[in-house]
Structure formats: C-alpha cells, structure tokens
Amino acid sequence: MRKINLDLKNQSYDIRIGSDIINLSNVEKFVSNKEVLIVFDSAINGSRITQFKEMISKSTLKLELIEVDATEKNKSQKTLSKIHSILVENKFSRDCLVIGMGGGIVCDIAGFSAATYQRGVNFLLIPTTLLAQVDASVGGKTAINHPKGKNMIGAFHQPIGVIADTSFLQTLPEREISCGLSEMIKHGLINDINYFCWLEENIEQILRLEPKSIEEAIGKSIEIKTFYVKEDEKEANIRALLNFGHTFGHAIELIGEFKDYNHGEAVAIGMILALELSKRIGNISKQDCLRVRDLIEKAKIDTKIKNPINPADLYKGMMGDKKKKGDILNLVVLEELGNAKVSSGIDESLILEILNSSL
C-alpha cells in the first residue's frame, strides 16, 4: 500500500492507494464511536457493500446507508435533500461521519452533503472508479449540478481521508477505465512531460490493469493533483490549470444533456479543442497535437461527436464557466507539452473558428 499525504494550511489527510485495502485497520479509526452514513453507488456489487457494512457496524454508534444511482441527472438538489433527510431524521450530530463510496458523482454529492449538514461534518471517501481515484476524491471540491450548468452549486470541503482500492477497478467496463485515463493524460500535459511519456509507454499495461502499472499511474496522478491543491486550495490561482480541457468539456456535457458523453470523453474532446487553440496562438506544434491525439486514441477514449453541435451554442455554454471573470473567458492552454498557463481574453472569433473547424 502506498500513502500520499495532503498537508494543507488547516488540515492534513492521507490518501491510501493499493489493492484490497478496505479493511478494519485502515477504516476503524475513522468510524469508531461515530454515527455513520454510507452514501454508496448503485453500480457497486451488493456483496461488497454488505461486507463493508458488516465490517464497520460493531465500531459505529449508529449506521445508515443510502444508495445513489450515479447519473449526472441525479447529482441534484433532490438527491442532496434525500441524504440530508436521513441525517436529520436519524438525529446525526455534528460529530458524525459521511462516507462516500463510489465514482466521481457519489464522491461529489457525499462531500457536498457533509459540507452543508450542520455547517460542515467530516467525510471519508472510498473512490471506486479510476476517474474518482485520480481526480474527484482529491482536493475537496464538492458539488451538485444545476440544470444550466455542471457543478454550479458546491463548496470546498476536504475529506478526512481517501482510500483508493484498486481492486474495485477489476469489475469496471473498459469505457470507465478510459474515462479515468483522460484525466491522467491531462495531468501529464499540464505538469510533467516525463509522466506523459511514461503513459505513452505503459498505456496497454494500464488498460489491462496490471497492478504495478495501475498503482504507479494512480500515485503519480494524485501527486500532481495534490501539488496544485497544496499551492492553491481554493483555486484562486494555479489550481485552475487542472481545468485544462474542462471549459470546453463541461459545455459539451451540458449540450449533450449529460447523456451523450461521460466526463472523461467530454474532457478528452475538450483537450483536443484546447490543443488546437494552443497551436493557433503559437505555443505548440501540429506534431504535438497529433502525439496527444494518438495517446487519447490508444487509451480507447471515444472522442466522436455523437450529435451535431452548434458552435455558437457551445460557446454560450462555455460562457457559463465558473472560472470566467465578468465577460472574460479564462482558458487553460499549453505553452508546451508538460507546461500549461491560463490565457484570458482570447478573441471569440478565434474560438468559434476552432469550434467550426473541429466539431
């Protein structure tokens, strides 16, 4: 088992990575003598939930569970209210613990329910998808969606621990593994060309979930993400670089009504568009773009446009981005492979030209 510590100004917690590490020795200190609510993903095998419940039940003061059908549609005020109702009706105190066990959607909504119950209670994350292990579970971003935008209602609220058990990945469909790889490729592109090169060399082993390769990749991605979180916990500055491809990607998800693309696919399309923008403003070469697209293809990430997208509609969706300042859109672009920056005030006509030629 590998352990990465995220040491912040007001809090420090460990992120554990390994196979079959959901055991009492790793969990008991969090649940002992606590009122515990487990928010779990309906996609998880029922026997694993039963085993986990039985394992911790003797250590807890009170134990409740709620199952969430993890769709973007259900990442909503309605689901949040259901979670809050269980906490209120069972008289959970401010000393309680919420456990989020599932993919990114469950991690986000479990975290936000903890952030907003009695002005903030503790939560533990057990991410069960590759995307959640390398991205959603790390850094304290919690949120639900609004009909007009993804993650528009949320809070920064750090977990007290993260347990990334790679054994959960063995039962995932290949599409879910590819979804996680999208964020991992992003980490290399914005921060570490050597990691990007390593992904190029090891992509087949990662897709096969070979233990050494997958754990090394998860660990490296988490190291990169924790670097940005340590430096800029509330995303006032360099943490925004983690949004490479996301301004385009979130708008694509919204236009597809959260049905046409999963998050990793939308981000991959967004990265391709951001690469084209980076090329057009003179930062990277055509060969760089082709190299990244080749890795995205080898990672088996589907970047086909499912239904026609109107560039003007996509641009309108991008203007709803949380990171814009007034009417000025901030976009993350690459200065070179492995190095990113935020670019402000890019001409609307250039963005629309890229969208028209690429979609």
Annotate the PLM regions.
Residues 105-112, 133-134, 251:
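Short glycine/serine/threonine-rich phosphate/pyrophosphate-binding segments
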Residues 1-96:
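ATP/NTP phosphate-donor binding region
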Residues 2, 12, 283-359:
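C-terminal charged capping/lid subdomain of soluble metabolic enzymes
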Residues 202-312:
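Active-site segments that bind and position negatively charged phosphate/pyrophosphate groups
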Residues 70-71, 101-103, 244-245:
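Glycine-rich beta-strand-to-loop/alpha-helix junction loops that act as flexible
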